[in-house]
């Protein structure tokens, strides 16, 4: 794991997590983005945090509405249509 100047404590539950990156599930150590990605170069991005209950994200439609609205406001292409993003969300559960 990358080191930083911030104090943190490793959570053993995160040791074997898989991360969705560009259409594929990646092991933690393989989940990378290019340093030329606009999120790195420009610091742009939008995000939504989801609460999952019984295998389903609560209020997913409202979260996706806000995500796409935020992306539109900064001219950010999510890269997935709503259906594909919904499938990607469920793939991570």
Identify the meaning behind each predicted range:
Residues 1-93:
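Conserved alpha/beta cores of soluble small-molecule-handling proteins
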């Amino acid at each position: 794991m990358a080191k930083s100047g911030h104090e943190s404590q490793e959570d053993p539950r995160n040791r074997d997590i898989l991360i969705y990156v560009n259409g594929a599930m990646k092991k933690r150590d393989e989940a990378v983005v290019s340093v030329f990605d606009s999120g790195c170069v420009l610091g742009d991005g939008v995000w939504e945090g989801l609460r999952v209950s019984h295998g389903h994200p609560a209020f997913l439609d409202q979260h996706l509405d806000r995500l796409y609205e935020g992306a539109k406001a900064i001219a950010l292409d999510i890269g997935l249509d709503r259906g594909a993003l919904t499938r990607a969300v469920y793939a991570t559960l």
